[in-house]
């Protein structure tokens, strides 16, 4: 198997001679935020974080995607936070794509390297710092947890994708699979953040059209992706943001194609707006 790689934002600025022929688009059903538009001037700081900047690539928006936010966070050496999450109802997933981070979760220390994954239930006590000599980057997916009477909160856990086997879809000859960090039938969880892998030339062979919202961040490779009525070229470092019921399908390119996938799951549909 080829070495695992993880793409990140371009940062910097394009040259003044650059042409405006990029792929960024925002439609009624989906958005594509290419890597090339994730530049320094669109980053933000966060309260109680030091030497840190974030690209906020998704947030709840009425009439579009309403359930989650997603950040790409870059922490310089010596940076981090002792008070990272200000919303007591928020659950989160951290997924490290570059560098090394020191996570303390419920009093226990963990070292997160590329591929490192941490699930943080609402109310979890955690801190995060970059104690190394190089910048670190991670994805932070946040959702307001939907508690259900009689169902306990999910437990915090830390792992690395290298320690989790890919589960291949049936009848795909091991060419389309998912790295699942949570069992699908564990109804304590109301969101999944997985990694989808398509081997070269593999396809999603039908237009998935379903209630789940999606954030898809391309970790490596390239593909042609069906989004609503359009076929869109995407590559490592691009982000696709889908509202509920946006049709989607995929043809993978000449190399392995992988993306980090958010979806909301395991709860009744709300009956009010």
Describe each region flagged by the PLM.
Residues 88-102, 106, 211-228:
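Glycine- and acidic-residue-biased ligand/ion/polar-headgroup-sensing regions
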Residues 158-225, 232:
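Surface-exposed interaction/gating patches
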Residues 51-60, 69-88, 179-184, 194-210, ...:
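Conserved short histidine dyad/triad with adjacent acidic residue
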Residues 1-67, 137-191:
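A short, N-terminal "cap"/entry segment at the start of jelly-roll beta-barrel domains
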């Amino acid at each position: 198997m080829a070495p695992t790689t993880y793409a990140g934002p371009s940062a910097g600025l394009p040259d003044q001679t650059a042409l405006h022929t990029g792929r960024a688009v925002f439609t009624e059903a989906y958005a594509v935020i290419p890597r090339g538009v994730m530049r320094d001037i669109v980053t933000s700081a966060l309260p109680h974080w030091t030497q840190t900047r974030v690209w906020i690539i998704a947030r709840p928006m009425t009439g579009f995607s309403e359930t989650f936010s997603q950040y790409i966070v870059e922490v310089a050496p010596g940076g981090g936070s002792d008070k990272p999450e200000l919303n007591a109802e928020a659950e989160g997933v951290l997924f490290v794509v570059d560098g090394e981070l020191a996570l303390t979760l419920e009093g226990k220390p963990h070292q997160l390297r590329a591929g490192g994954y941490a699930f943080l239930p609402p109310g979890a006590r955690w801190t995060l710092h970059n104690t190394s000599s190089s910048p670190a980057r991670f994805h932070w997916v946040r959702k307001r947890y939907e508690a259900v009477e009689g169902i306990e909160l999910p437990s915090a856990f830390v792992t690395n994708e290298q320690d989790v086997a890919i589960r291949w879809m049936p009848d795909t000859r091991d060419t389309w699979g998912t790295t699942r960090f949570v069992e699908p039938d564990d109804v304590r969880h109301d969101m999944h953040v997985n990694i989808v892998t398509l081997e070269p030339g593999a396809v999603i062979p039908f237009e998935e059209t379903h209630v789940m919202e999606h954030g898809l961040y391309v970790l490596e490779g390239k593909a042609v992706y069906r989004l609503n009525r359009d076929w869109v070229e995407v590559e490592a470092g691009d982000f696709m943001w889908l509202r509920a019921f946006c049709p989607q399908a995929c043809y993978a390119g000449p190399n392995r194609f992988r993306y980090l996938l958010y979806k909301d799951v395991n709860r009744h549909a709300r009956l009010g707006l």
